[in-house]
């Protein structure tokens, strides 16, 4: 048998080392792939989060602070009181924004609520800057186009199967889920329902605390207890 020369031995060595390095890379990829998949929290974890007392306390603090700011802004002395919605609609908007902030923008519905709030604020500033008589014609035109769009969507929805129609309705109810797939819509709906349940519990607790507390003291009266939202 012929002996392998040192030169040929050197030529053979890199192939074995490269194959070993390829194997090690494949092993690393296999090990790293499960960790990359487990980034989004499971529905059970999100349900536990919204049902915890700690999360309810965080939301309660944010909501009370937001309601105080709303009360101050709606006073006649405030400059922005005319542009702010009043009554139940204003409270609803504030409660939803506080809920989205408590969610930290980790879900589609929370990001949609926060982006909507930013858009509304931008529109209000734009209306204050520009006062044009042509705005009335533009608004009527936009209302007509919205009505036409709604009728087209209804006709399209009638041709869809029953399951797809229900998914469409569900995706419209949950913010930020209009163009999402069924698994995403179901995941977002589960999280949104759990968050709304916590919102109801918190608002009920705040309402009972406000109704049971004595009225705020009159000016000049000392020693009275302060109102929760005062």
Curated annotation (Swiss-Prot):
Q: Where is the composition biased (Low complexity)?
A: 33-46
| One GO process term, biological-process aspect | regulation of DNA-templated transcription
Region Disordered, residue ranges? 1-52, 210-230
Entry annotated with the keyword rRNA processing: no
Listed InterPro entries: bHLH_AtIBH1-like, bHLH_dom, HLH_DNA-bd_sf, IBH1-like
Keyword terms of this UniProt record: DNA-binding, Nucleus, Transcription, Transcription regulation
The UniProt function text for this chain reads: Atypical bHLH transcription factor probably unable to bind DNA. Negatively regulates brassinosteroid signaling.
Q: How does it assemble?
A: Homodimer. Interacts with PRE3.
Full protein name = Transcription factor bHLH147
